Regions:
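N-terminal anchoring/stem segment of glycosyltransferases
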Residues: 1-64, 73-77, 200-204, 215-218, ...
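A residue-level signal for conserved active-site and pocket-lining positions in enzyme catalytic cores
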Residues: 6, 33, 71, 86, ...
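Short His-Asn-centered micro-motif
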Residues: 7-10, 36-38, 83-85, 91, ...
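Extracellular structured ligand-interaction cores
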Residues: 30, 82, 174-175
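Short acidic (Asp/Glu) patches
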Residues: 61-69, 95, 151, 155-162
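GT-A fold catalytic core of metal-dependent nucleotide-sugar glycosyltransferases
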Residues: 68-116, 121, 127-131
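A contiguous pocket-lining binding segment that forms or flanks enzyme active sites
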Residues: 116-156
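Catalytic core and acceptor-binding pocket of nucleotide-sugar-dependent glycosyltransferases
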Residues: 139-246
Length: 247
């Protein structure tokens, strides 16, 4: 068995046969690949598919149970890379993982540069307060006034963080890809805090991540990698659109 794992999760489509896992475009020597799902129709030659029980009505909550808490599920691995299910691995990631975990036990994409080359400033945000306003703006401008979450929940969460002294312009993670030495004590403490904040607040996990790592004092790294323009990961946007249209 390897000591490094790449993992993803896919919940909420247990009766649907349209969804699939993206097979990496390169050899993943030294890595195990694991997918957690409630869908018995998901099959893959590249990924070990682990069929697990759902605990929440909202599949996003089950997804985050695995996304946020790898130390509960991968005690036998030293290093984990979590990728969203709509991410295709396009090149060997050994060097980039080693680089970004050389001095930190956790590294995550920096939202302030994500989309900067192709989608412009609209997608570049560096603060949970900006993110909350952006979510409201998206919903207000949606033809059916469709919001990514209940805005009362979001604004109450943000208000709580503000009253606790959480600063503005303190960074924003894009949690599409996360590198971790997940069994280290400082990471475990921060991830358990993140889970508690996520579990009882908004389903938008990027709102609770910065607060959790700030509150626990985790020394982590924002990776200067644009998910829309890099050599290691490709966001399969069409797959995402098709998946969301079936919700």
């Amino acid at each position: 068995m390897n000591n490094k794992v790449i993992y993803t999760s896919m919940f909420g489509f247990a009766d649907n046969t349209d969804y699939y896992l993206h097979t990496p475009e390169c050899k993943m020597e030294g890595w195990d690949l694991v997918c957690f799902t409630d869908n018995p129709n998901i099959k893959s030659d590249a990924w070990e598919v682990r069929l697990v029980t759902r605990y929440y009505v909202d599949g996003a909550r089950d997804n985050r149970l695995y996304k946020i808490l790898p130390h509960r599920h991968f005690k036998e691995y030293d290093v984990s890379v979590c990728v969203d299910a709509d991410v295709l691995i396009t090149n060997n990631i050994d060097d980039i993982v080693n680089e970004h975990l050389s001095e930190h036990n956790l590294s995550v994409l920096d939202h302030s540069i994500c989309g900067m080359t192709k989608t412009g400033n609209l997608n570049r945000r560096s603060c949970i307060y900006q993110e909350a306003d952006f979510i409201k703006w998206l919903g207000d401008n949606h033809p059916r006034k469709k919001y990514k979450d209940d805005m009362n929940i979001i604004f109450n969460q943000i208000k709580k963080y503000s009253e606790d002294g959480y600063p503005k312009n303190n960074g924003l993670a894009r949690t599409t890809v996360i590198f971790r030495r997940h069994n280290e004590a400082d990471v475990i403490e921060a991830m358990e805090k993140w889970w508690m904040e996520y579990k009882y607040n908004s389903r938008r996990d990027q709102l609770s991540f910065p607060y959790a790592v700030w509150k626990t004092g985790l020394d982590f790294k924002y990776m200067p990698i644009d998910i829309d323009d890099n050599q290691w990961f490709q966001l399969m946007k069409q797959w995402r659109k098709e998946r969301q249209s079936k919700k």
